[in-house]
Design a protein with these regions (language model features):
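Conserved beta-strand and immediately adjacent loop positions that scaffold enzyme active sites
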Residues: 6, 21, 128
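Single conserved hydrophobic/aromatic residue that forms the stacking wall/gate
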Residues: 1-12
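Short linear motifs in intrinsically disordered
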Residues: 10-17, 120
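A short, compositionally biased
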Residues: 15-21, 108, 125
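Predominantly a core beta-strand signature of beta-propeller blades
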Residues: 29-30
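Short polybasic amphipathic segments
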Residues: 9, 20-26
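An extended, acidic
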Residues: 34-149
């Protein structure tokens, strides 16, 4: 069973429904992709967007995140960049189920961590945090805590 998303042909292969592999198809050849597992908080690359969902008053509660934002978040493309190891954290507000569901298996197969800002399962959508490793994920959950309610 194979599912491909977008023109970039980012895919996930599900072998026996247990061994999941995320890959891209480049010139007809499959290339396995994975998150940047070596990312540290000091070297983190962050893509984020609040799309008018987070008021300026709330944004003032997360100054450290605002300082770390280096890339705009553009939905599936940003999540794809995380799965390929190009960025380490993606933060987005108010995702709908159809925004995030197709990406969850790709992110997980690439080794990423995904949850809502209040550390619930992302399957129900909402404000989403995706990270390349557990340490960074937990750090950003703490930073987002003032606005996660």
């Amino acid at each position: 069973h194979t599912t491909c998303r977008r023109q970039r042909q980012m895919c996930i292969r599900d072998s026996n429904y247990t061994d999941k592999i995320a890959y891209i198809v480049d010139n007809g050849k499959r290339k396995k992709i994975s998150v940047n597992r070596k990312a540290t908080f000091k070297s983190v690359k962050v893509a984020a967007a609040f799309h008018g969902w987070l008021s300026l008053d709330k944004q003032k509660k997360i100054p450290q995140i605002l300082k770390l934002m280096q890339f705009p978040c553009s939905d599936a493309l940003s999540y794809s960049h995380l799965a390929e190891g190009r960025v380490d954290v993606v933060i987005q507000c108010s995702n709908k189920i159809w925004d995030i569901h197709p990406l969850i298996p790709i992110i997980k197969a690439a080794g990423g961590y995904i949850s809502t800002w209040d550390n619930r399962d992302a399957i129900n959508a909402g404000s989403i945090l995706v990270s390349s490793n557990k340490i960074i994920h937990n750090k950003f959950l703490k930073l987002l805590k003032p606005v996660s309610k």
